[in-house]
Amino acid sequence: METFPLLLLSLGLVLAEASESTMKIIKEEFTDEEMQYDMAKSGQEKQTIEILMNPILLVKNTSLSMSKDDMSSTLLTFRSLHYNDPKGNSSGNDKECCNDMTVWRKVSEANGSCKWSNNFIRSSTEVMRRVHRAPSCKFVQNPGISCCESLELENTVCQFTTGKQFPRCQYHSVTSLEKILTVLTGHSLMSWLVCGSKL
């Protein structure tokens, strides 16, 4: 099973134990009509996509002790690189979606070379908002641990196939239904995308 650790705060999925200051930062981040972003032209008409609270991919557990600047940067990074509201993308198939989205969102390595892989979580803002109200995980029996899991979300993984420099990168895609599993233990807030079925 492949998992992607995610920074839960960026999704705005805050469990009851989250501190008041953390809640304040999240409220400040997610106002302004759900963060409407105008995406620049890329040989197509200018589009507007609604981008909500999003996680950033991490490789280790994340503490709640993030500064406001770090959190803002984290939120913006994930919004632009990993979140895709289905209403905002008219592309017909996953391969085109991967190729178009990586150009549109300017997904590349720092040196301008093609990124080996990237994933786009495709979900309506309504589904994302409801995750914190999702049922509790049945396997957690420790009173010090809070856990919940979402409904299934569409996750498209774009795997690099050809090209050298951005924007001439081509990707192969695999889309699967996955659930967001969220866990709060003491001062650590963690979340994972847990693989479900391939589409």
Curated annotation (Swiss-Prot):
CDD domains: RNase_A. PANTHER family: RIBONUCLEASE (PTHR11437), RIBONUCLEASE 11-RELATED (PTHR11437:SF22). InterPro entries: RNaseA, RNaseA-like_dom_sf, RNaseA_domain. Belongs to the pancreatic ribonuclease family. Residues 1-16 form the signal peptide. It comes from Homo sapiens. This is Putative inactive ribonuclease 11. The keyword Acetylation does not apply.
